[in-house]
Structures are given as structure tokens and as C-alpha cells.
């Protein structure tokens, strides 16, 4: 879509100089008609006193017992479900991958300290996996799955561990494979969901692989916590199959309890995920008071095709909600996160009237729209369950009941005011590391802890414990900029889809506007207009790139708005000859493609064009890494003059790295204040990140004419801005791909990170406003 400001930036006809270089005699496209800007329907700027502030992100692979030998940093460790000691100071999380629980000191929320781990092997059980934890008094109850893959004979136990010395003082056989645990508010009993989960690779008679029934059925264990732990005993609560059948549950003969929550009356709510049901149990007597279906929902305005496009015109028909996490809103309403596991999942969350079982409110497509607005849509899950809400917690903030909904695939927690359960109000979105599952409010300290389970060391994706603080007292230590720092506006009720922003350019016609583009993570290619006069910055236009009247997909790694109108794109190819400068008219149509000289293209490896800048008669480009024929660590900067079609090349000495598997390259180039600015980065993130910087290079006079076998003149560089402290200031994982920067017409320096479309990445986009370039950049 084109808008008035997009038109002004590209309105002029293409100058004869550029037309000659483009080898075309066609007239430049006329200025497109003015159209309305997209606007954001959400007020993102809550007062500091009314929002959460991210305090810290602690990667749990760093947590090990004091004095223990170093562990393999690449070994998988996760943080799935968390609890906290009654004083609110020690978080305890499950790590099923490493078969242990971990302890983290959060007395200073801005500086979590790992207190080590307790392996189940140390308790004498080498192959058992913790599924949940709950602290009560001086103890923590550790729910352990001992099934070991024998689905037909599930087993489990709950260990009672004294926190002070981490010794097990008691263990209770649960008689089945457990999932979650909850403690009553008065501390008198615990409820444990015994799921006896299905084997997704087993085929029941007459059914398909992974189907139910797969006996034995699940149940709930109630544990009386009166007296010393050695006196604690459990009581099994079975469900009435006939009642489940009458309620319309799927496969009532094989129920699979997933999650439990207890209200102030001692009622236990149980989600029966695969059966698409909810049960309510009297925690004191063990009587099953109610079973009802979670029902179905049809959802429209969502992306249901994994085709590389964020196409929100899709829908799903009436689909079982299949709730995972469940929580009480007061004593009369229940909230569920409708993840889905077998046949369903509706991409949102629902509030039920617990008395009638009727739906009081449903999120519809709003959770997915929230992901799209904030660049957290995961295209590779479009045909499955989209953002996949899984975790949920209910807390109270400033006297207001508040729901916290965790999106497992889009990596965020959404905050809602549920003072009126029939009309929740969205308040805030919190970024997390991948796979947030444990959502742990600590009301006594106005803290929130989120534990994330996805851990892929090879991709730099690490499981973590993230800490957020609510209110003014945590604002000063909160991450800056606050998330989201860039969002998209809505067009006809749907947000502009975006992500994987790998480029920035100033708008020559508007001092408060920038241009950016998505790379090959999404297609077809578009140039996005960004209004930086707002906070957060707002993507409010999307200009499709076309060729011969048809949309095209390009790996756009650089965008330069031409002073005379139109754009130049740096397009990276899978192979050297596919790297091109693409000249685009104001209406998005491709005017010309300019290939790199064959001598250069043939010397490229997997990385090529990564940045572009344009002034009145020159185009500058950055090649990400060295040519095969160039000295190690010397990348190239190129100068192209459209008037004569000539290329001149210069050398640029990259910083070095000693980290195995790491490399350093260029990601952006700009012309500013009579010099070239280049962005240099390594491929590391989080605590490992070392090189994220802008360097200044004086504009050179002479260089090498196209030749790849002639050593280029290496240009002296000078550090202009170390970006690593800016990226670390968010209090999240320092992002790997800082790939775009620009000095806007208002003189400010802006920087953006590429979130890789959430594939093998945590997906958080950081958009930095670093203030006036004259101050932000060293001379």
C-alpha cells in the first residue's frame, strides 16, 4: 500500500543519469495516489507505574553447583515450570532435559544469581524427569515422571525436598505419570494432575497414530499437607466416565488431566486437554463437582498457510479449544490457554463461567494479531497452531485481577486486566526467550518470573529465567527501550505483517520517516514505511515490489531511498551471481537489476550484498564477508556510478574472533557527514556477543576497478559507536543480527535488529533511537 509520505519520498521522476544506468527508455512511474496511513489501535505507552519492566534474563545453562567442574555449554538445559520460596527470594525451576531442578536467587531482580542445581540422580533416580514444582513452607514438592517411555505402564512420584539443604525428606508414589501441581492458598493440600499421556507414535486398534484411547486413563491426586512431610499422604480422585460422556468430552474413557489450579474455596480446576474438557473437584472432599466441555471456536482473520506470506485472510472452522494451562479468576470464573494438542487449539484464550460452564469471553484472533503487530508472528507454524498459547497465570496487580498468557511459539507473555471477566482489557506485551511455559507471579514483591524451555545451543537459542518488575520501583532498572520498540499499524482491522528487518534508510522528503524491508524470511518483498515520530515507532505503509506487474520475492538486505525518487535495494543471492542492486520506482515496480561484476560475484561464498547507500550520483554497497581471493578478514566496500555503470572496490579490515564457528561481517552502510558509516557484527548473541559496532570510514578517492584478484586498498576505520551496550540495555538476550541503521532527516541515529522471522531465533526486534547522530557517534 502506498501513502502520501511514501509517495513524496519517491515522487520525482527518475533522473536521466539513473535512467541511463538502468538501460530503459520508459518514463518513470507517476506518483501513486495518496492513501490513508495505517494506525495502531493500541496505546502502548502505559505509565511506568502501571506496567512491567524487564529486569534481567538469566540463561540457565550458566547455573551449576558452586565448585562443580564446568559443564558442556552446548548441553541441553531447560527451564520449564517455576515456583518460588515463600519469602519470594529463590526461584526453583524444572529442567527435564538435564533431569534436575535449578535454584536462582532473585533477591536483586536485576541481577539473578544461579544457586546451582539438584539432579534427580543425586536423589538416587538417574532416569527420571521433573514435570512440575511447588514450594510450600520450607519445602519444595518436586513432581517426577518415572515412566521412562513405557506409556502403557505410567508411573511417577512426588519428592519432598527441604530447600535449605536440598535433601529429600519424603517421597509419595503417585500411581501414574504426573504433569502439573498446585498448592491451595492456605497450604493445606496439593493437587497433582496425573495425565498418563498418550504415545503419539502408537496406533490404537481401528484408529490413527497417536489417537486415543490409550489406557490407562488419568486422574488427580490430592495430597494432605498436614503435619510433618513424612505424614503426608495422597488420595486418588477418579473421574466419572458417564459424566464426562454426557458433557460431550472426546474419548471420555481415557481422560488426560493436564493442568490444575485451586481457588480460595479449595476447588480444584482441571484441564483435560486431549478430551477438550474441564473438571472441578472439591479439594477437601475429593468429590468431582462438575465436568463440562471446553467447546469449539471458529477463528477468522488469521494466517493458516505456510507459504512465506503473512496472510491474515485465513480461518479455522469450529475447532476444539483443547486447553492447556488453567487458572481461576476469583472463585467463579476460569481462564484457559487454548494450546491444542491432538485435534484442536484455537490460538487464543477463553474465560468460562465456572458455575455454568458457558463461555464468558473468547480472544478470537487477537492473540495472533498481537504477534503480527509486534513482529512475533511465526510463519512456520501458520498451518499448525499459530502462536500457540500454552502458559497462563492469574495474579492481582494494584487490586486488579490480571491474566498473564504465554505464547509458546511467538515468545511473549500478554498481560490483561480481567476485573470484568466478560471483557478482558489488553494492557501490555512482554518479550521472552523461546518457548515460555512457566508463568510465575510473585505478588508479594510485584515480580513476574517467566521460564522458557526452548534450548538450541547451535542456534544461540538458550532456555532462561526472565524477571520482570511491576511499577515505579522497577522502572529505573527496567530494560531500555521498552518492548515493543517498533510495531505495525492496522489496515482494515488487520495489522501490517512484518519481521526480519535487515535494513534502514532515511526518507529524503520527511525527517521523521524511515524505510525498511523484510528479507527472504517473508515474501513477496515489500518496502515498509516507518513513522519514528511516535513511540514505539510505527510501520504504517507497505509497498509491494513488483516486476512485470507481479509481486516478487527478494532477499532484501539493504534499502536506500534515492534523493530523486524511488529506491535502490541490495539483494543477496544464494550464489554469487544472484547478488544484485535492484532499482525500484516510486510505485514499487522494478526498473532495473544490476549484477555485480563477474570477477566479484564469482569470489563470493554464502554471504554477499548486505547494505546499500545512495546519494545524488553514487551507490555504495557492503559485501558481508571477504571474497575467496581476498586476504582473510578483509571484506569489500563497493562504489557504483550509475552514469557509466562502473564499479570501484575498496578493502575493509574486519575485527577478529577466536570463537569456534563464529565469523564477523558487515551488515549495513550509510553516507553521513562526509564519511561512510559501516555496521560490523559477529554471529553471537546473549552473553557470548562481542562485536556489534558502527565504524567510520573516510570516503576514498581511488580503488580497484572490479578486479577480484587484485588486493584492494584497505580503508582505515575508526570506532563510531559500540552497539553492544545498547543491545544489552534491553535486559533481554543481546540480539545477534543488528543489521540496519540510518540517520534520519531529523538528525537522529536509528538501529534495528533482524529477528530471522523467529526461525531458530527468539524473535525479539530491537529498534533503537540513539538520539542525535552528532552525539551518538564518536568523531
Question: Where are the regions a protein language model picked out?
Answer:
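Bacterial lipoprotein signal-peptidase II cleavage site
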Residues: 23-30
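Sequence/structural signature of beta-propeller domains
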Residues: 25, 36-779
